[in-house]
């Protein structure tokens, strides 16, 4: 296929049009008085959202060069979303400002490589200063503030704060669509995995269709149990102790399952068998997690152990186990706290190393199960359109809160970017490097300016006044007042602000150093089919 090539000024101008189109659509959502954007969906109702990355991903432009510019900025939003989970609109606004200012200077004859150096120096200094002024997040109220600002909803802030308090900062918090109108929190404490009882005859509560075991022993193995003789020695020891037993194995079938069910029905002893969770290497890791949590051992041939040699000492213990048709929940495992902490550390290390999104998700789940539990926020709304929009906002708020726990908080409303202004302005540089620093300085003003514009005010007036205010004092666009942002609970996670600035600068620097752009030439329209006049009904008279 033939290619279309544009060079230097013409190439950058074409791409800038795409950058502006996308950024102008995204930036109307910034701040407490930001508007929504409606996205057409091929099927179902349109999606109404104020989430920057969702809007950016939907935009496709007809002109190939403009589309490349738009896609570059969409990449800024997407990367910021991947790293911090929020701040995508801020990242887009920063990228647009840096690209526009940079292009003015390149057109005026500045060397793009010098500008790039200056931009990188300025951003490094800004990030160092952000780290200095960030404050660690403390207590439930701070978490609620971060979440409420991100979701623009205080009720959501309280829900997320409560969820994090219940399951810990490492706990898994998932979102589900509720059948009702209200948004609720449901917490599953302890370790839960998605395997239910091997036979419905093992239930202890026929109303709820679940088996509840109090202070049970837990036999953990990666083997298939089909012969009762294999586990008879350990069964006899458990019966003597007068305690119930949970068996977690690859499978329990045939004669072994039948014998267990018969003894359960006769009331000889209380036993429930479930299949081991996961598959392959992940199954081994999860069984090991359960063993560490309950203070037991995994009976596996890899360690030279067989089921006949198992004793009650090698079994795990827990305060309570609840088994339903689909899930097993182990509560209050009596494992050694030091070993559990070591295991959590090991999983954290794996989390940092992995590049796979799927592996990261699974490791996060394992970490949460060891750390304390899973919280489910059930999102409710009156219509499907509102439900989708609300779910996206809560997802952003959740990511924002996690980022705040990791790296602390800074003043919100774009104030923190203006608070690093003096530090960046003090960098000593000459020529094009100094121009690059000025490009970043101009971009640092842009989020505050846009928040003010969206609130119906004159952006430049707000920016100029903010430059003269003390660190931490900013403009509350929701009320139109000048307040101490941290004290008023208007905060942003430092990680979100840092990621937005870093990613915007990275793409802007690449954009400015672009000298040629190559795109596919649009194909000419295929000629229309020839007229088939002779095939009309009149022309087919001879066929009658």
Swiss-Prot record:
Residues annotated to bind ATP: 29-32, 86-90, 413, 476-478, 492
Enzyme category, top tier: isomerase
UniProt-listed PROSITE patterns: CHAPERONINS_CPN60
UniProt catalytic activity: ATP + H2O + a folded polypeptide = ADP + phosphate + an unfolded polypeptide
CDD domains hit by this protein: GroEL
A biological process term (GO) from this entry: protein refolding
GO molecular function, one term: ATP-dependent protein folding chaperone
Annotated EC: 5.6.1.7
DNA-binding is among the record's keywords: no
Coiled-coil regions, chain positions: none
Entry's Gene Ontology cellular component terms: cytoplasm
Subcellular localization: Cytoplasm
UniProt superkingdom: Bacteria
Pfam family membership, one: Cpn60_TCP1
Assembly, per entry: Forms a cylinder of 14 subunits composed of two heptameric rings stacked back-to-back. Interacts with the co-chaperonin GroES.
Family of the protein in this entry: Belongs to the chaperonin (HSP60) family.
Function statement: Together with its co-chaperonin GroES, plays an essential role in assisting protein folding. The GroEL-GroES system forms a nano-cage that allows encapsulation of the non-native substrate proteins and provides a physical environment optimized to promote and accelerate protein folding.
Designated name of the protein: Chaperonin GroEL
Organism per entry: Bacillus cereus (strain G9842)
